[in-house]
Swiss-Prot record:
Residues 161-359 form the CP-type G domain. This is Large subunit GTPase 1. GTPase required for the nuclear export of the 60S ribosomal subunit. Acts by mediating the release of nmd3 from the 60S ribosomal subunit after export into the cytoplasm. The lineage of its organism: Eukaryota, Fungi, Dikarya, Ascomycota, Taphrinomycotina. One of its GO terms (molecular function) is GTPase activity. GO terms for biological process: cytosolic large ribosomal subunit assembly; protein transport; ribosomal subunit export from nucleus. Residues 595-607 have a biased composition (Basic residues). The gene is lsg1.
Amino acid sequence: MVLPKSKNQIGLGRAIQSDFTKNRRNRKGGLKHIVDSDPKAHRAALRSVTHETDLDEFLNTAELGEVEFIAEKQNVTVIQNPEQNPFLLSKEEAARSKQKQEKNKDRLTIPRRPHWDQTTTAVELDRMERESFLNWRRNLAQLQDVEGFIVTPFERNLEIWRQLWRVIERSDVVVQIVDARNPLFFRSAHLEQYVKEVGPSKKNFLLVNKADMLTEEQRNYWSSYFNENNIPFLFFSARMAAEANERGEDLETYESTSSNEIPESLQADENDVHSSRIATLKVLEGIFEKFASTLPDGKTKMTFGLVGYPNVGKSSTINALVGSKKVSVSSTPGKTKHFQTINLSEKVSLLDCPGLVFPSFATTQADLVLDGVLPIDQLREYTGPSALMAERIPKEVLETLYTIRIRIKPIEEGGTGVPSAQEVLFPFARSRGFMRAHHGTPDDSRAARILLKDYVNGKLLYVHPPPNYPNSGSEFNKEHHQKIVSATSDSITEKLQRTAISDNTLSAESQLVDDEYFQENPHVRPMVKGTAVAMQGPVYKGRNTMQPFQRRLNDDASPKYPMNAQGKPLSRRKARQLTALELGVSPEALSSATSKKHNKKNKRSKQRSGVVIDDY
């Protein structure tokens, strides 16, 4: 039953109308109407204000002083350069930064261990080490915050530096292992100074690992630079040595290097001339043995300390020297956690120091990512490293290696001629199917991680030139990049020619293979949705029911059931009558023969089986 409607129109609509009537303006005053910008301005006059933001304070002061502001849009200039990545420096800024870093490079040191002797207790030594480490951290912070230098992320754990101190104190020769693609970045000159401070008789040696990535001309340039600056060095490749160990080859040479071309080890005069060839394991072992021949009296074994940045190949070098995997190796920086001692021979022992990131000047963090110092999987900002990679690797090399098409903005339209990060990442992501689910756009972050890892691993190769190289870095790597493009184009041309030589022969051969295969496998049937397919001999005679019309047609497309004049199938009753006429029986007899009514009788009554049992 519907409730009676109230005659008193009391409700929300009446309240809204009443409020509108009270607050409507007075039309007798004319068309002029003054409205406060803030509807609660009358309440704000009585509100206590104890704190204001900078913007509110500025506006309130201007309002009290009755100051009017006029916007002068013609004096505003918007500086916008979409082609310049904000996370990278321009060429002029990078040059100024390099010049400033060269003037202050002596201020960037490594922490020193305080002097101690037999009378120093463990508590006193721990306190002195902590104070020295804190003072070193304080000086670096002042260098960054006050003077604005960009310092690479360095090791902040005191325990790791203690491992380095112990390795230097125990070692007779400190071997710095550096990456051949950028040796000066991974070489620490302050470490060499500290080694001489700890023991004047200690010696420094530079082992340039991953030298197989450099061409012969590039190694010649670096060799001349090291010789001019009196830096003892040796080119080495731990990967090639490990592969040769697995093959069991006689490691005489990688590049026709004979035993008499072994660079002389560091003697007192240090006037040796080093070769630009890649040294073998026998050469490296010979240098270590020649060092050990200069042992002082009373010492039976010489210790070599291997130090360097993470992921430069310290553990791989030790494994190649020993001949088996004695040290844990990983592509993740910082795998070795504490120094380890390995006996190479009766006179030589090796100390594997954990990888340390020494403090050094850097222009941007993109350089640290491409040098393999910062882990790529933990990277958040990827446009800077990707743009720097696109500057170093030519567009043709990227297109050749990854079979993509990079379209850049023409110079006539304001482009720089160098692809940006998005112009490289988007085509690569589309070609690999890396798409974002929520927007449907290419997943450039995932593409950036793959390309950056290829750069760090050496697939995208870029070698930094020495400081005395007269030309640019692109000219220094021109030979290697041209080899990649020409080798890939030659292989593609060879495949096309090989395919076009004998198409008929290839097709005939493929037909023979198909015939032989299907004769040996007669029970092969198509894997399609439907009922099981019957196979009778080697000939396929089954038929899956995939469409409704298949039930009414035979294999030759003839109708399976009788049709009427209109081409439609007969009904069940008419089809039964037609069948009865063809068989010469009545339709009732045909229906009774196929009927199921004999199974539908009354089952509640008593059933007689009809079997007679004889009485005996």
